[in-house]
From Swiss-Prot:
UniProt protein name: UPF0178 protein Lm4b_01466
One Pfam family in the UniProt entry: DUF188
Protein family membership: Belongs to the UPF0178 family.
Organism lineage string: Bacteria, Bacillati, Bacillota, Bacilli, Bacillales
Organism: Listeria monocytogenes serotype 4b (strain CLIP80459)
PANTHER family with a match to the protein in the record: UPF0178 PROTEIN YAII
NCBIfam families xrefs: PRK00124.1
């Protein structure tokens, strides 16, 4: 039975993930740094890791198995986990595909170089209720068809 792993530090759709997982009776593991520690986890399965730059990513890589569902905005982590045979969603419900990763990583690299030169672009728009609903619908549809 697959599980859902969530890169939870900045994930805006944790409640939606939990609802979908309960409906499909899937386990969810939220992975976050101790910077986001809370004693109130509402019975959810949370794993807290050191605050090091890649600590949460490393834990997720170790936990992920073929067929698992991952939710992350981290393109680098997504590319590694896709290679392990997982299904990776963005926080906006986009299902990443291996054949897109090279281009996405290249764009990420170019944006990082631009930032080093002081050139900044606008970030993503704030999550709306419609965005949350779209994420939930896409994850639900994926699981229904799996």
């Amino acid at each position: 039975m697959p599980k859902i792993l969530v890169d939870a530090d900045a994930c805006p759709v944790k409640a939606e993930i939990k609802q979908v997982a309960e409906h499909f009776q899937l386990d969810v593991i939220f992975v976050a740094s101790f910077n986001h520690y809370s004693v109130n986890t509402n019975g959810e399965n949370w794993i807290f890791v050191d605050t090091g730059k890649e600590s949460a990513d490393m834990r997720m890589m170790n936990l992920a198995k073929k067929g698992d569902i991952i939710v992350t905005q981290d393109i680098g982590l997504a590319s590694i986990l896709l290679a392990k045979g997982t299904f990776v969603f963005s926080n906006r419900g986009e299902l990443y595909r291996e054949e897109e990763m090279s281009l996405m990583l290249d764009i990420r690299y170019r944006h990082a170089k631009d930032r080093q030169q002081g050139k900044y672009s606008k970030g993503p728009k704030a999550m709306s209720d419609q965005d949350r609903s779209l994420f939930k619908d896409r994850l639900t549809t994926f699981l229904q068809n799996k």
